[in-house]
Amino acid sequence: MATPAAPRTISFADNNDNQPNQQQRGRGRNPKPRPAPNNTVSWYTGLTQHGKNPLAFPPGQGVPLNANSTTAQNAGYWRRQDRKINTGNGVKQLAPRWFFYYTGTGPEANLPFRSVKDGIVWVYEEGATDAPSVFGTRNPANDAAIVCQFAPGTLIPKNFHIEGTGGNSQSSSRASSNSRNSSRSNSRGGRSTSNSRGTSPVSHGVGSAESLAALPLLLDLQKRLADLESGKSKQPKVVTKKDAAAAKNKMRHKRVATKGFNVTQAFGLRGPGPLQGNFGDMNYNKFGTEDPRWPQMAELAPSASAFMSMSQFKLTHQSNDDKGDPIYFLSYSGAIKLDPKNPNYKKWLELLEANIDAYKTFPKKERKPKTTEDGAVVASSSASQMEDVDAKPQRKPKSRVAGSITMRSGSSPALQDVTFDSEA
């Protein structure tokens, strides 16, 4: 299918799939497709809201499955459609319906990505971009609505029903009717030519060349979904000594903590010191960015631009190295406003309360003193909090604190008021 130069839109109008039979008998083998309606129609069946709670998805969830899309394309918005009916006793409000549209398509095609507007809920997959989508307008006269499906693990809001599944016989019957019409058209020897504008999320026609070409992709998608449900989606990653050494050789503030290179290995023990971090419970310290809560945690982290533009910086001369060259530390501080109107506001507070200063509750781990052959006791030395820092501040006598971690009780006065530090 030819791709227009300009981004295409998915049309959604009143999202009503009750169209007359597009294939009428006696019109030849290749009936002319009906033109697309003026209004836009979603590619997917909608979500019916049966309660007062608004639609909301956790970050990284809420985009319907699409066999023809890439991760970068999986972003868009859900739009609320308020409904009412005139009765003998006046106007009666019906349950609202929500329909999905890709970014840059549908009734809100000109709405910038993640713009705040009543009745609009933005969703995206991790790694998606804010570029307008290439998926075009669906012509309901030629294409049946795709029953909305989500990736395993997606948390569908309470009191929301996916149309076309379960007891929604009306939507299911419409989809079945359109499917029979398409099959009847192909059985007469012709292939239904879609008049939908732009790329379709699915291939058209039963047994068509497009369907056969997409079959391996659909089978692969089915296998991936089955693997996700069975927990076999990822092979265990083996971290070799070479990989660990390479990760450790990175500058401290450029490292990424994972299960194979955990938070303590990457950034040191949690604690109150000026060169220590105080964020992270036992689970986060073990898994790092592989913690299931990481997507919500990452939303609180500023971007590189925000970090450089919102922070108060201070350059401090700490000491000199063996060659006499000065060693500097770049100290920074700042603040992030937590918006109570954000749907993840309560989740953020839960995460912060569970992870800030969580090291104070870590279980104590006693160390057995080493003994020599003559029975003398040798005190064991603790690991440095900053193995990659060549020169360290002058220390006062070491003392034991919670968690049996040997901490520095004193440091350079210039760093006493700094919460986090990074090497310049």
Swiss-Prot record:
CoV N NTD domain mapped to chain residues: 39-164
Please list the residues that bind RNA. Answer: 83, 97, 138
User: Do you know which InterPro entries this protein is assigned to?
Assistant: N_prot_C_CoV, N_prot_N_CoV, NCAP_bCoV, Nucleocap_CoV, Nucleocapsid_C, Nucleocapsid_N
Residues where Phosphothreonine is found: 406
Which keywords does the record carry? ADP-ribosylation, Host Golgi apparatus, Phosphoprotein, Ribonucleoprotein, RNA-binding, Transcription, Transcription regulation, Viral nucleoprotein, Virion
Ranges for region Disordered: 1-41, 159-207, 230-251, 365-424
Check the record and name the HAMAP family matching this protein: BETA_CORONA_NCAP
> What name appears for this protein in its UniProt entry?
Nucleoprotein
Q: Please name the source species.
A: Bat coronavirus 133/2005
The record lists the lineage as:
Viruses, Riboviria, Orthornavirae, Pisuviricota, Pisoniviricetes
